[in-house]
Design a protein with these regions (language model features):
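Active-site and adjacent substrate-binding regions of carbohydrate-active enzymes
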Residues: 1-270
């Protein structure tokens, strides 16, 4: 574990620090990238892959149409690396795609890749060797909320131009919010051309969506605030981030209507 910890970043440094959990009952460490109750699987063992495919096919036989592959970039481990986005991950996903196309061609694989824009698209594979059928449009989601907070559309337009330039076979699942937090994985190279720096901008976005900035009725909450890295994620429903929660508490009809219109606008845009 100590050797892995030298190169593997922590996902939840404040709520679940480290990448391993000691199990005294069996006298072993288990790799737990996310939370102690979420064990990482060793896909280097072919038995693990076979069992996971069996589980997938069992669900498909129950009538499941879309299978989500959770935290795709993390599923292969290699000492001396970040254990993120390794080439073997794409091999595994490609094998799963081949199996579904043969056994259950009507089923879609939905990949969860919550990372920077340039690291998301490779999980579609290529037109010749496809991997995931669909990916969450994480970057557009975060860019949309950036636009809500800043009233600036340049980043969102740039992001949509990137999406629209991809092959039509690449399908994104567009969404405003989900059960996960917002990690502000924006295109900071693009933002730097407008003089916007990553750390101060993340701080502003988190302040805006907690209702701490001028003109904001949002009521989001920080998640996994890391004072060392000066980074934090944000949690909140669409209604809360658009100001409906605060407006209802204030019993202000005008603010309630404004919040509802913002929610309708965002859903219409999607």
């Amino acid at each position: 574990p100590d050797e892995y910890e030298k190169t593997v970043p922590q996902v939840f440094p404040t709520t679940a620090p480290g990448n391993f959990t000691w199990l005294p009952d069996i006298g072993h460490y288990v790799m737990t990238t996310f939370y102690p109750y979420q064990w990482d699987l060793n896909y280097a063992n072919p038995v693990v892959f076979n069992e996971m495919v069996n589980n997938m096919l069992y669900l498909v036989n129950q009538g499941i149409d879309i299978v989500r592959i959770d935290a795709v970039p993390y599923i292969w481990k290699q000492l001396g690396t970040t254990c993120r986005n390794l080439p073997q991950v794409h091999t595994i996903v490609r094998m799963m795609r081949m199996i579904t196309e043969i056994v259950c061609p009507g089923v879609l694989l939905l990949g969860e890749v919550v990372m920077e824009p340039e690291k998301v698209v490779p999980y579609f594979g290529t037109l010749e060797k496809p991997e995931c059928h669909m990916l969450y449009n994480v970057t557009t989601m975060a860019s949309t909320w950036h636009t809500v907070a800043t009233k600036e559309v340049a980043l969102l337009k740039q992001q949509m131009d990137v999406v629209n330039s991809l092959p039509k076979e690449y399908v994104f699942l567009n969404y405003l919010r989900c059960h996960d937090d917002i990690g502000w994985g924006l295109d900071y190279d693009f933002l730097k051309t407008s003089g916007i720096q990553e750390i101060p901008h993340k701080k502003y976005l988190n302040e805006y969506f907690r209702g701490m900035a001028a003109g904001s009725d949002a009521r989001g909450e920080l998640y996994n605030d890391d004072p060392v890295l000066q980074d934090a994620r944000l949690c909140g429903t669409t209604a809360s981030l658009c100001g409906l929660e605060a407006s209802l508490q204030a019993k202000d009809p005008a603010r309630i209507e404004r919040a509802i219109q913002k929610i309708l606008m965002l859903n219409a845009y999607l």
